[in-house]
């Protein structure tokens, strides 16, 4: 009979099989009421599943991350319950959990309108408020197939036929008259599923294959309580205000058009931001002793066959032909960097060799996945490749980590989650090589006092990697930085150096990206700052305005003086009211507005205002220039009044 060990080390002895709910009730009615599921020997199970042998048990509640995920999964089933009541002939496909919520793909003989979605959400609330029990039954494969075949659920039958072994026992979850199939676990009662909202609908092909039928995907969000739901909806509202596509149009940064899907047309102000980012990155490359190179954007298909990209990546590559040769427009920079490394004999004394490029890359992303600057087809990578010996890996990774944090801190990103992906089952190289490589990455992180979590088995077949995910002001995650070891590509492309023993050896290659795609990072920054770029990055840093025509000459003199001081400045001499000008440039998020009236001309000063509406009063021109230069030079995130 089972002995149940709880997280605090205490044990409970039973003379019969028990469920997590039984144990929770044994501990106390409060825990039983909060119990959503259990974790038995590390595996999530339903609250009703029986434990027959000795086991470690944790009770899962809505306060746990897993508990929230279960709530969201059960809300997907609730959606299925509601839609079958409203439109009984609907065929249900799949309804998984996603970040912050869930979705369900359905085959429906009508296109859902906003009114339909509102009616569906209303029915979901009506059902959830009944607080009915969710009943789980484990049945044979044949019984499950018969259940769904009798209900006309052809997609569920297809899942059973193609994805579930005949000797398996699928879990069926009954929501009153509605039944769904899932591995689980799910909530034991719908009282846990009161705080949700349906968000939008979209099209989705069955099994993600464009040859299959287009289904309707209904997205929803779900949370453990009303406060969390409202906070999330408020974040979404704020995110909509910060949408880089909207701000990009308002500030005239860039545009995109149908004739070039996923390609960016940079306007002057947007390109100014892009070039400032390049200047910043170049300054760091120099500080961390990188060479900057430039490879061709198109190379013969034969080279991509050697690297393995053609076999594994060709659908995402653009190709063209000339003189009976097929060329691939590069989706990444690494093969070109190996070609540069291969020019001339290399010695161990030449290593490490750090090679960086602002590489123009193209990937044939599906048109439906394109999203402003965040997901494009043509982009510029700020990546680099380090060629080194195995003994140099730790020091080089250390340098990469310092560079990552050095650059992210400049933009004010403080919350960074780090993951270390280890060896997969299918891999190249010896266990000893992987042992050392993984240890080098882990020690480098530890030496920099960086907490991290392992992603076991998630590394590439050619080496382990570190991923850096930064979180913005709305707590959204953006995976940008990577440090990836590669034991394969240098060998495939015949890279070598002469070792200390005079023998030819294959270098280790470290792929290093920090910003990732420059376009995407500008999109991230646009939303992070809501268009209020720090002064050093702002396309126009200062606008100087006159009140009447009599100050025009003074404004022009000051404009030239600030420009000569390296400040991006414009003069606004339009015959408009000063209040109108200030409002317009405030909406354009120009960091500083200098106003010149007769008093300023007489005193040789300027009246200084910020885009946040702060009046800094009258200041000496040279003082303004000196303070602005300091703010720009230091790449400060704060303005003068802060």
UniProtKB/Swiss-Prot annotation:
Q: Which SUPFAM superfamilies match?
A: Class II aaRS ABD-related, Class II aaRS and biotin synthetases, TGS-like, ThrRS/AlaRS common domain
Q: TGS domain location, by residue?
A: 1-61
Q: Which EC class is the enzyme in?
A: ligase
The cofactor named in the record is: Zn(2+)
InterPro entries xref list: aa-tRNA-synt_IIb (IPR002314), aa-tRNA-synth_II (IPR006195), aa-tRNA-synth_II/BPL/LPL (IPR045864), Anticodon-bd (IPR004154), Anticodon-bd_dom_sf (IPR036621), Beta-grasp_dom_sf (IPR012675), TGS (IPR004095), TGS-like (IPR012676)
Could you list this entry's UniProt keywords, alphabetically sorted: Acetylation, Aminoacyl-tRNA synthetase, ATP-binding, Cytoplasm, Ligase, Metal-binding, Nucleotide-binding, Protein biosynthesis, RNA-binding, tRNA-binding, Zinc
Q: Quaternary state and partners of this protein?
A: Homodimer.
Role noted for this protein: Catalyzes the attachment of threonine to tRNA(Thr) in a two-step reaction: L-threonine is first activated by ATP to form Thr-AMP and then transferred to the acceptor end of tRNA(Thr). Also edits incorrectly charged L-seryl-tRNA(Thr).
Write down what this protein is called.
Answer: Threonine--tRNA ligase
Its source organism is Shigella boydii serotype 18 (strain CDC 3083-94 / BS512)
Give the organism's phylogenetic lineage: Bacteria, Pseudomonadati, Pseudomonadota, Gammaproteobacteria, Enterobacterales
Gene label: thrS
């Amino acid at each position: 009979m089972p002995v149940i060990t709880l997280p605090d080390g205490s044990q409970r002895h039973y003379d019969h099989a028990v469920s997590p709910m039984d144990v929770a009730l044994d501990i106390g009615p409060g825990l039983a009421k909060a119990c959503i599921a259990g974790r038995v020997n590390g595996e999530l199970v339903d609250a009703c599943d029986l434990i027959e042998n000795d086991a470690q048990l944790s009770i899962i509640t809505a306060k746990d991350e897993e508990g929230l995920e279960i709530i969201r999964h059960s809300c997907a089933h609730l959606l299925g319950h509601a839609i079958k009541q409203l439109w009984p002939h609907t065929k249900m496909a799949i309804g998984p959990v996603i970040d912050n919520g869930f979705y369900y793909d359905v085959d429906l003989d009508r296109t859902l309108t906003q009114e339909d979605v509102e009616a569906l959400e209303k029915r979901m609330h009506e059902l959830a408020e009944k607080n009915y029990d969710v009943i789980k039954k484990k049945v044979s494969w044949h019984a499950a197939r018969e259940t769904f075949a009798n209900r006309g659920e052809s997609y569920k039958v297809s899942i059973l036929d193609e994805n579930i072994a005949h000797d398996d026992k699928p879990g069926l979850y009954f929501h009153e008259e509605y039944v769904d199939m899932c591995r689980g676990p799910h909530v034991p009662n719908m009282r846990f599923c009161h705080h949700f909202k349906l968000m939008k609908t979209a099209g989705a092909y069955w099994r993600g294959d464009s040859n299959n039928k287009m289904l309707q995907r209904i997205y929803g969000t779900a949370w453990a309580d009303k406060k969390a739901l409202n906070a999330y909806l408020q974040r979404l509202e704020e995110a909509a205000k910060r949408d880089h596509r909207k701000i990009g149009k308002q500030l005239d940064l860039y545009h995109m058009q149908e004739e070039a899907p996923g390609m960016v047309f940079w306007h002057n102000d947007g390109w100014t931001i892009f070039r400032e980012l390049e200047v910043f990155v170049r300054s760091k490359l120099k500080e961390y002793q990188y060479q900057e190179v430039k490879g061709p954007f198109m190379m013969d298909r034969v080279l991509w066959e050697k690297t393995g990209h053609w076999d594994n990546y060709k659908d995402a590559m653009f190709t063209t032909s000339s003189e009976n040769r097929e060329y691939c427009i590069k989706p990444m920079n690494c093969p070109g960097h190996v070609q540069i490394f291969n020019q001339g004999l290399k010695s161990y004394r030449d290593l490490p060799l750090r090679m960086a490029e602002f590489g123009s890359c193209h990937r044939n992303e599906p048109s439906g996945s394109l999203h402003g600057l965040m997901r494009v087809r043509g982009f510029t990578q700020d990546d680099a490749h380090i060629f080194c010996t195995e003994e140099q890996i730790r020091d080089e990774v250390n340098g990469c980590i310092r560079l990552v944090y050095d650059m992210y801190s400049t933009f004010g990103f403080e919350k960074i989650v780090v993951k270390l992906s280890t060896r997969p089952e299918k891999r190249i190289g010896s266990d000893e090589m992987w042992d050392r490589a993984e240890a080098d990455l882990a020690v480098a992180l530890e030496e920099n006092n960086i907490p991290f979590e392992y992603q076991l088995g998630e590394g590439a077949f050619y080496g382990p990697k570190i991923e850096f995910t930064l979180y913005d002001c709305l707590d959204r995650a953006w995976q940008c930085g990577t440090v990836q070891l590669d034991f394969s590509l240098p060998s495939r492309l015949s890279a070598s150096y002469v070792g200390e023993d005079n023998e030819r050896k294959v270098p280790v290659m470290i792929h290093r990206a920090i910003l990732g795609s420059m376009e995407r990072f500008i999109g991230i920054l646009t939303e992070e700052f809501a268009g209020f770029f720090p002064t050093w990055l702002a396309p126009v840093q200062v606008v100087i305005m006159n009140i009447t025509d009599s100050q025009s000459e003074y404004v022009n003199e000051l404009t030239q003086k600030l420009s000569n001081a390296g400040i991006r400045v414009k003069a606004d001499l339009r015959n408009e009211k000063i209040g109108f000008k200030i409002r317009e440039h405030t909406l354009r998020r120009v960091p500083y507005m200098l106003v010149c009236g007769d008093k300023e001309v007489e005193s040789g000063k300027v009246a200084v205002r910020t885009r946040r509406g702060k009046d800094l009063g009258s200041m000496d021109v040279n003082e303004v220039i000196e303070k602005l230069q300091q703010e720009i030079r230091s790449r400060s995130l704060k303005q003068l009044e802060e």
